[in-house]
Amino acid sequence: MKNALGWHCALGIIPYRDAWRWQQQLVAERRQNLAAPDVLLTLEHPAIYTLGQGATTAHIHFDPVATGIEVLRIERGGDVTYHCPGQLVAYPILNLRRHCCDLHWYLHQLEEVIIQTLRHYGIKGERVAGLTGVWVEGYKVAAIGIKVTRWISFHGIALNVVNDLKGFGRIVPCGIGDRPVGNLRQFCADIQLEDVRQQFVAAFSRVFGLEFAPKALADLLIPTSS
């Protein structure tokens, strides 16, 4: 059976609010046109903390005004996390009606994408019962936080590749205080983010049965009237 076509937009370091707005527009378009192809955005963010719907500010251990780093509450699931350059962020905009209308299945598949990506580098990624994400030797290297509306997904994955981890020390990452955060460079010293991006997209294609073609984001977004 031939894989369905999807679009992959490989972006650089993008301000969080811009990527958030683009996701919302892509979701709105797919709610209007269920035949629109699935989209995968891969990118990095400048330093920012985001809080999911269930997050508590008690897990933030710094003064955002003093540091100048934005803290933003968004509609994804999960608690507080940190984004910064060197972290591969992936936002799948999928019509889950074409895959499986089951959020547990979807989260499991996202974890599988990460595990297969790590396997390419000889790194064993593992799940932890009762928690969402992927760990390596006890270090959490990937966080997952999603939102699904009318079975269209957005938000997604943050995979620590070569990023500075100091920012995680200011929070209780994902509300989990007893497990350290790590990145892939700890386990593969010469790893490169761009190579990880390629392996991630290949793994995503396998796991979700999609054939991704590169696409400019501007070609996907419908211009809005000013």
UniProtKB/Swiss-Prot annotation:
One BP term from GO: protein modification process
Chief location of this protein within or outside the cell: cytoplasm
Keywords: Acyltransferase, Cytoplasm, Transferase
Catalytic site positions: C174
EC number: 2.3.1.181
Catalyzed reaction equations: octanoyl-[ACP] + L-lysyl-[protein] = N(6)-octanoyl-L-lysyl-[protein] + holo-[ACP] + H(+)
Compartments, record wording: Cytoplasm
Top-level lineage group: Bacteria
Family: Belongs to the LipB family.
Extra facts: In the reaction, the free carboxyl group of octanoic acid is attached via an amide linkage to the epsilon-amino group of a specific lysine residue of lipoyl domains of lipoate-dependent enzymes.
Name of the molecule in the record: Octanoyltransferase
